[in-house]
Amino acid sequence: MRVAFYAPLKPPSHPVPSGDRTIARLLIAALRHGGAEVTVASRLRSWIGVPDEAAQRAMAKRGAAAAARAITRYCALPKRARPQAWFTYHLYYKAVDWIGPAVADALDIPYFLAEASHAPKRAEGPYAFSHAGAEAAIRRADAIFCVNPVDRVCLEPLTAKRRLVDLPPFLDLARFTRRLPDRASARQTLARRHGIDPDQPWLLAVAMLRQGDKLASFRLLAEALQHLDRPWQLLIVGDGEARAEVTRAMKPIGGGVFLLGALPREQLPAVYVASDLFVWPAVNEAFGMALLEAQACGLPAVAGAWGGVSTIIADGETGWLSAPGDATAFSADIDFALDADLVAIGKAARRKAAKHHGLDAAAATLIAAIRRKLAK
């Protein structure tokens, strides 16, 4: 099975780390894990962040030119070497796939989408042109893999329900949790390195320190911790342009906050294993890869019940879902969690991640849907 892959928002080779880049790479890994031969068809980043129709039309022309080049390139190959399917990850009105539908039509191959979203309110206004392009791609899709179940509501009017396939968020668990360190030694090492009290509860947040929703989550977390009347320490892993704002937000809650900065991916399991509770308000997040990483490492979580967070956390079993945007409720949920049997909850989290959120499960879902279409 030969699959042409495209990520219009951010190509998998983009130099800046992000959840989007991670998921693009994971999708490629899952497809390959299932036996597919995957090639990146284009690295054109179609994202338009300003409500400028002229810029949107210019991007559409660039996409059409890229599609024409791809069609010429593929048609020059023998049929046995051409893609049998096109797969686009993360399409919405700011990042339209101007390439895939045209190539799929020209080669007469199925067109697949993952994490597509549709915003009907954008049908009018400055993004109307790009909105129409995204809608056309959604209507063209032979199947759409829904990583965030919230997207289904707006996708259902555009396509048959049978074409919507649930794809729970996933990780390459074998790589990420292959050698989980011993909790006691990991905790001792971090405590000594950063001056953290190993005998007090460790709360952990892992996120880029960015403006917008990430900063909103940090501010809500800071507000919640002001109401937490018990010992705690907060470890923050991540960095970014909003570091100063995050530092200011945390200042009123005293000296129990430790900004560890951005860490190499291979060092993250030690931090997850050493901590007691993952805490993240997840403002406006689809699901959050760090949350899934925490669960895979056996770390219970309290998270805001935004978007598809509930696809990762089984409320009361692997962690706790908190009322979105409510700092008081978030504080109460942390307080409740710290009195719970976190060891048992953590074991349940790891079991759930292993069963539903690994490459095996993702590959099975992806490959089965593609094969069904190719068999027709």
Language-model segments: residues:
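Short hydrophobic beta-strand element within catalytic cores of glycosyltransferases
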Residues: 300-303
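Short alpha-helical donor nucleotide-sugar binding micro-motif in glycosyltransferases
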Residues: 262-263, 270-275
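Nucleotide-activated donor-binding/catalytic signature segment of Leloir-type glycosyltransferases, i.e.
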Residues: 244-266
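Conserved donor-binding/catalytic core segment of Leloir-type glycosyltransferases
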Residues: 196-215, 222-225
